[in-house]
Amino acid sequence: MFSSKIRDLRVERDLNQEEVANGIGVGKNTYLAYEKGTQSPKLETVEKLAKFYGVPIAELVSDSETNIDEKLKSKIRMIESLDEPEKESLFILMEALLMRSKSREIQKEFR
């Protein structure tokens, strides 16, 4: 699970939550929520966590109990190979698609 993976990485490196939060540019309470699993980070924050810990994004998001399918793992590796401006463009597009999807769900609820 993502929350336990980032907690384990932090503990392995003998860091406190505030150090990690500062390292990735979020507040301590936000990072605490990531570790508790009560809040999910944006994709760009997952990328920052991966860089901070020096691990591939796939290691953070893959779950040994539920195994992300190989197609998704392949896509994550492709994203990791992009340069920063390309990643930023992709993340903006993904956020827009997710917001559009959420908006459609909300509209359906009020019909």
From Swiss-Prot:
SUPFAM superfamilies: lambda repressor-like DNA-binding domains. Pfam families: HTH_3. SMART domains: HTH_XRE. Disulfide bonds: none annotated. Residues 17-36 bind DNA. InterPro entries: Cro/C1-type_HTH (IPR001387), Lambda_DNA-bd_dom_sf (IPR010982). Residues 6-60 form the HTH cro/C1-type domain. Keywords: DNA-binding, Repressor, Transcription, Transcription regulation. GO terms for molecular function: DNA binding. Transmembrane segments: none annotated. Transcriptional repressor of the integrated CTXPhi phage gene rstA2. This is Cryptic phage CTXphi transcriptional repressor RstR. The gene is rstR.
